[in-house]
Swiss-Prot record:
Belongs to the UbiA prenyltransferase family. Protoheme IX farnesyltransferase subfamily. Converts heme B (protoheme IX) to heme O by substitution of the vinyl group on carbon 2 of heme B porphyrin ring with a hydroxyethyl farnesyl side group. It is found in: Cell inner membrane. Disulfide bonds: none annotated. It comes from Bordetella avium (strain 197N). This is Protoheme IX farnesyltransferase.
């Protein structure tokens, strides 16, 4: 009988890998930014704490389920072949137990210590990623990351709901930013990992439509992202400090995309992918800093 009780130290690390901690950290960071932007002053710290814990637990559960569903795909890809699910060192029953424990705990925390709205929105995000994206979209359409990107874009709305028990237009603007950011971020990865995805049999855009078309889409999305990131300023959510950061960070993003479009190399694609992660973290950091500058100077 399989159990996740008292695992070996090496197994603990394998469990952690299944939760994709780096991706989870960025998602939770964006959720926390949403929490602090939801109110003019300091948010209820109890809701911030338990909202963060609950969202992290459900995100980790969703990623673990993703690894279970994609274990055969992961085994064919160099980037993911070392995951415990791909190597067979962690059984499906163990992953289901882990995900059930994390997800169940997360839902209880959000429902009882935050609010039901956040719990249901986070659960819907879990289903959107673990089922709709992983099972239905990813293996069937090159637009998988576009359509399925909504679930990955939800953290700011989840954070906002944690504190305000509502999801107003301002929260959806933050969701829109991540939604538009997602395709160029993942397509940059898919470009320099094309053969990996081909071996896995996944219909990623560089495989179905070629490198040139993918690079064109990345460039177009980078322009759209630049425009969308100006919305917080024009909607009076943030001030000039944020606007300056958005223009500089967005300009660098567009420059990377233009260079990649004009002349492809794996290194240029890799640089864009890495910068896109830094970009999102810095952009959301600028949202928070500008917000607090406004609060303190009011």
């Amino acid at each position: 009988m399989t159990s996740i009780a008292a695992p070996q130290p090496g197994l603990l690390r394998q469990y952690l890998v299944l939760t994709k901690p780096r991706v989870t950290q960025l998602a939770v960071f964006c959720a926390v930014i949403g929490m602090f932007l939801a109110v003019p002053g300091l948010p209820d710290l109890k809701r911030v704490l338990f909202g963060t814990i609950g969202i992290w637990l459900l995100a980790a559960a969703a990623f673990a389920i993703n690894c279970l569903i994609e274990q055969e795909i992961d085994a064919r890809m160099t980037r993911t072949a070392r995951r415990g699910t791909a190597r067979g060192t962690i059984s499906p029953a163990q992953v289901l137990s882990l995900s059930g424990l994390l997800g169940g705990a997360g839902m209880l925390v959000l429902y009882h210590l935050v609010n039901p709205l956040t719990m249901w929105l986070t659960f819907a995000t879990f289903v959107g990623y673990a089922v709709i994206y992983t099972v239905i979209l990813k293996p069937r359409t090159p637009q998988n990351i576009v359509i399925g990107g909504l679930s990955g874009a939800m953290p700011p709305a989840l954070g906002w709901a944690s504190v305000a028990n509502a999801v107003p237009a301002e929260a959806w603007v933050l969701v829109l930013i991540i939604f538009i950011w997602t395709p160029p971020h993942f397509w940059a990865l898919a470009l320099y990992r094309t053969e990996d995805y081909r071996k896995a049999g996944l219909p990623m855009l560089p495989i179905t439509h070629g490198s040139k078309h993918t690079r064109l889409q990345i460039m177009l999305y980078s322009f759209a992202l630049f425009a969308v990131t100006l919305l917080p300023y024009f909607m009076h959510m943030n001030g000039l400090l944020y606007l300056l950061a958005a223009v500089i960070l967005g300009g660098i993003f567009v420059a990377h995309a233009l260079r990649l479009y004009r002349s492809y190399s794996d290194e240029r694609s890799r640089r864009l992918f890495r910068y896109s992660i830094l970009y999102l973290a810095l952009l959301f950091g600028a949202l928070l800093v500008d917000h607090w500058v406004g609060v303190l100077s009011a």
